[in-house]
Amino acid sequence: MSGHSKWATTKHKKAAIDAKRGKLFAKLIKNIEIAARQGGGDPDGNPALYDAIYKAKKASMPADNIKRAVARGSGAEAGGANYEEIIYEGYAPAGVGLIIECLTDNRNRAAADVRSTLGKGGGSLATNGAVSFNFERKGEIVVPSEGLDFDDLFEKAAEAGAEDVIDDGDTYTVVTAPSDLITVRQALQDAGVDYDSADLVMRPKNEIELGLDDARKVSKLIDNLDDLDDVQNIYSNWTASDDVLAQLDEE
């Protein structure tokens, strides 16, 4: 039930070092607005909103920004955009599969930007289902590993109904069935476990191991896609050796 996701470690470090604060906040605000629109503005009765707000607080978003995003999403305040959720499937270099989740108020712009960025990075759009068959929807709870015993977390997570616990170095990732995400998150909170985020994600069933050159191309393409205003999340099925990831981490 335990494993080690080396790319996740590099990804978390990279995000911590060079995260673009403005774009990060914009994505988090969209998450809050959508959650409030779909489930109401009370986080106590809207678990998705609770987790969106929690994630924003972890990123040090000012409380006033969060409050206004909730108000716009719930309709208590004017100004909320009418975001549409769109999922694109694509290929990066070396045949790596990508799932690109967008929240946009302009479908044509989102499609054009994603297509253009893929093309410039040596990738392409794929037909629906061509990539997603190799992914499955899961819940993920990211927990800081410092001061927390893996076996202790493993036991608590398993008792709460988690499917897996992965050691990513600086963090542990608790994997759940989509329908169990909130239950497991609440159980860990009740047990005094701090967490960074709780999200529904797409996890690859099979991964492609890349050498340095291809890993560099793929990570650059993913970074460029992530910079697009309409893109919320990107999931891929690539991995690499510790040596390759260490070199990427230094660049």
UniProtKB/Swiss-Prot annotation:
Subcellular location(s) of the protein: Cytoplasm
Pfam families according to UniProt: TACO1_YebC_N (PF20772), Transcrip_reg (PF01709)
Chief localisation class: cytoplasm
Keywords: Cytoplasm, DNA-binding, Transcription, Transcription regulation
Any single GO CC term annotated in Swiss-Prot or TrEMBL for this entry: cytosol
GO biological process: regulation of DNA-templated transcription
Gene3D superfamilies in UniProt: 1.10.10.200, 3.30.70.980
Transmembrane regions: none
SUPFAM superfamilies in alphabetical order: YebC-like
InterPro entries: Integrase-like_N, TACO1_YebC-like_2nd/3rd_dom, TACO1_YebC_N, Transcrip_reg_TACO1-like, Transcrip_reg_TACO1-like_dom3, YebC-like
GO molecular function: DNA binding
Family note: Belongs to the TACO1 family.
NCBIfam families in the record: PRK00110.1 (NF001030), PRK12378.1 (NF009044), YebC/PmpR family DNA-binding transcriptional regulator (TIGR01033)
Protein name: Probable transcriptional regulatory protein BLA_1344
Organism: Bifidobacterium animalis subsp. lactis (strain AD011)
Organismal lineage: Bacteria, Bacillati, Actinomycetota, Actinomycetes, Bifidobacteriales
